[in-house]
Amino acid sequence: MSIKPPSALSELVEALRALPGVGPKSAQRIAYHLMQHDREGAERLGRSLLFATEHLRHCEKCNTFTEAQICEVCSDPERDPALLCVVETPADQIMLEQTMTYRGLYFVLMGRLSPLDGIGPKEIHFDRLVRRASDGIVKEVVLATNFTNEGEATAHYLGQTLKARGLAVTRLARGVPVGGELEYVDAGTIARAMLDRRTL
């Protein structure tokens, strides 16, 4: 007869598998580590997750995470409202902010087009983006999706649609490596890509 772990532990392992890059073995190691060596850390993690799920929402304007209705960037009167930078994730937005080269506003897609995974225009809030970009204030849309196949397809789709509405559309320059994700690229490279962006 084989021994099964307690159901509470199995449930924890399954929950940890929801994290990106965490497979069954890694989830099991993390769960055992937390229960054996860091129960205080496990409790803090649980409280932080609960607090985040209860208090974080999407900004009504740019769709990033915020605790208020409108995020800090969208509320900043020093920002240039004629520039709108489209990124895939809040992590990409933070990387661009760290370059200190961009002073416009953002729209966060919360993903990228991936038909094989069932992610279409609706799932990346395409209609909200089009409404935001067509507000009469935005003059240039900077497409800062990642240089992966899905990111390029997303940029192409968005670029075609937004150009058809008379907007100037630019794309980050290729300082970012092919297949590269902004979250993992250094700030200097991203800054150069932003400054050298090209018209689509």
UniProtKB/Swiss-Prot annotation:
GO MF, one annotated term: zinc ion binding
Biological process, per Gene Ontology: DNA recombination; DNA repair
Signal peptide start and end residues: none
Zinc finger boundaries on the chain: C4-type: 59-74
InterPro entries associated with the record: DNA_Rcmb_RecR, Rcmb_RecR, Rcmb_RecR_Znf, TOPRIM_dom, TOPRIM_RecR
Domain Toprim: 82-177
Function according to Swiss-Prot or TrEMBL: May play a role in DNA repair. It seems to be involved in an RecBC-independent recombinational process of DNA repair. It may act with RecF and RecO.
NCBIfam families referenced in this protein's UniProt entry, alphabetically: recR (TIGR00615)
UniProt record similarity statement: Belongs to the RecR family.
Name assigned to this protein: Recombination protein RecR
